[in-house]
Amino acid sequence: MTPPEGKAAPSMSTVIRDENDKVFRLDSLQGRPVLVNFWATWCPPCVAELPALDNAAKQLGDDVTLLLISVDRGGRQKALPFLQDRGITRPLMGFDPKAALSREMGVRGLPTSFLLSADQRQSWAYVGPREWDSAPMIAEIRNLLRLAKASPVPSRQNSQDHLLV
């Protein structure tokens, strides 16, 4: 589910915890594009796409900030060692064990990802795993970031599995 056209994505001030167990809010990243990925350790498609997300973060560099948000009930204590054991270190990490942020953003299945423009508007949403580090996906993300800069509200439907709002 995506926010109505032209609206900021909800819940920018909902509090979650970061990898250092400090309070973290999405709006603290305002001014930078953010790729937000909701995932869980018990979700096989989520786990399968983690290395590709980590590689995509390396390829995109400073163009976009990757934020992985675990919805595991065990929170940081469960998800952080899981990520570290797999060598996933590049993205920012957030922990939403009560699923407050995921509910407010309309997450209905895992994995779910949102691309937020620098002004915190949702550019698109994906439900399901993706080949994040593939050349076509990296090119699509960069194109969407260009569109978001050029127009405050780009709008088109690209396919059935993701919307550009």
Residue ranges of model-derived segments:
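N-terminal "domain-start" segment that seeds a small globular fold
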Residues: 1-26
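Short gly/ser/thr-rich secondary-structure transition/capping motifs
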Residues: 15-21, 48, 93-96
